[in-house]
């Protein structure tokens, strides 16, 4: 009798497991995967089962947005940090405390500082490397005695220096050069001493996306325990759907800070900001220059999700932008952290 019942019960159990509701954010009632084969992930990115236990997906990497459905790369010791137990919607992929860093073929302990080159001083923190430039990033504006300043690499010196070029075609006024400006952020003074603690804070990294919602990060020890910690904020340099080149005035080659017709609401993975914002965004150029944030500030933004849950995220707000020719080279990983090109985003 028991044997005769065991067969149907086992079959029913298997069917129940195969048709179980998927759990986690945005999981459908049943597992439904794309008909095509599993996605092809970039080199170094793991192919894992999604948080619903249904489909194979490319794991999210350090600093990327994650959800219960879109997991972080477990093979790199990453987990989805939601910030607080109340917020279980959207997090940021973070390395576990004490995770080492692998860079340039070398392994560095968490908390260890090193020079990646003569230009950058770096620190490993829980699997992530944060770097600050050692070379001066001063600005030299065009002047009568130096109308065409540019930075050049001099023999025997690590840091680039300013030199003055004579214009090829002299005119009465001459073309106006766009001066490069390092992004100016508001934070603690890096030289400030406090209770046996030298407060140090890296610059905010460039936004991970040149259009749409992205992530910007920095490393600081500006806290009660003087312990290095990673901070992240949302950022949007410009909306993806905006065709900004149409707004460039006749005879001009750039639009530095385009005017937004009406206040906007920000969207983040299906959640919408509670308030509307008359935000500023950076424009574009048609002559090869990059337009990037110059002055920014960080403010909290509340997002309301379809299920009524409210979550709060820090977000970058642009005060001014600068358009310049000092776009990063494709082979300089650290320059791209600060002065990322305004095209060719990798999804």
From Swiss-Prot:
Residues 254-328 form the CTCK domain. InterPro entries: CCN, Cys_knot_C, Glyco_hormone_CN, Growth_fac_rcpt_cys_sf, IGFBP-like, IGFBP_CNN, Insulin_GF-bd_Cys-rich_CS, TSP1_CCN. SUPFAM superfamilies: FnI-like domain, Growth factor receptor domain, TSP-1 type 1 repeat. It is found in: Secreted, Extracellular space, Extracellular matrix; Secreted. Residues 196-241 form the TSP type-1 domain. Major connective tissue mitoattractant secreted by vascular endothelial cells. Promotes proliferation and differentiation of chondrocytes. Is involved in the stimulation of osteoblast differentiation and has a critical role in osteogenesis. Mediates heparin- and divalent cation-dependent cell adhesion in many cell types including fibroblasts, myofibroblasts, endothelial and epithelial cells. Enhances fibroblast growth factor-induced DNA synthesis. Belongs to the CCN family. This is CCN family member 2. It comes from Rattus norvegicus.
């Amino acid at each position: 009798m028991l044997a005769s019942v065991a067969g149907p019960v086992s079959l029913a159990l298997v069917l129940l497991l195969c048709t179980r509701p998927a759990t986690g954010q945005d999981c459908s009632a049943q597992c439904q995967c794309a008909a095509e084969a599993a996605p092809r992930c970039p080199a170094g990115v793991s192919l894992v089962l999604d948080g619903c236990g249904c489909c194979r997906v490319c794991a999210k990497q350090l600093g990327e947005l994650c959800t219960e459905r879109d997991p972080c790369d477990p093979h790199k010791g990453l987990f989805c940090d939601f910030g607080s137990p109340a917020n279980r919607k959207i997090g940021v992929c973070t390395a576990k405390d004490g995770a080492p860093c692998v860079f340039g073929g070398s392994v560095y302990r968490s908390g260890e500082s090193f020079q990646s080159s003569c230009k950058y001083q770096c620190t490993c923190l829980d699997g992530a490397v944060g770097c600050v430039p050692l070379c001066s990033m001063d600005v030299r504006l065009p002047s009568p005695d130096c109308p065409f300043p540019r930075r050049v690499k001099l023999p025997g010196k690590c840091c680039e220096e300013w030199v003055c070029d004579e214009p090829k075609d002299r005119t009465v006024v001459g073309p106006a050069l766009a001066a490069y400006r390092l992004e100016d952020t508001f934070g603690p003074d890096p030289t400030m001493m406090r209770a046996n603690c030298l407060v140090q804070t890296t610059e905010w990294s460039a936004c991970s996306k040149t259009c749409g919602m992205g992530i910007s990060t920095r490393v600081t020890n500006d806290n009660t325990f003087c312990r290095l910690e990673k901070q992240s904020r949302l950022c949007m340099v410009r909306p993806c759907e905006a065709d900004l080149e149409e707004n460039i005035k006749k005879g001009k080659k750039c639009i530095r800070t385009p005017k937004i017709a009406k206040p906007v609401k920000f969207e983040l993975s299906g959640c919408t900001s509670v308030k509307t914002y008359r935000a500023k965004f950076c424009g574009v150029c048609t002559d090869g220059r990059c337009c990037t944030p110059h002055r920014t500030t960080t403010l909290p933004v509340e997002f309301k999700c379809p299920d009524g849950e409210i979550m709060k995220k820090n977000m970058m707000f642009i005060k001014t932008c600068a358009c310049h020719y000092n776009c990063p080279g494709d082979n300089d990983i650290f320059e791209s952290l600060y002065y990322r090109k305004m095209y060719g985003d990798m999804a």
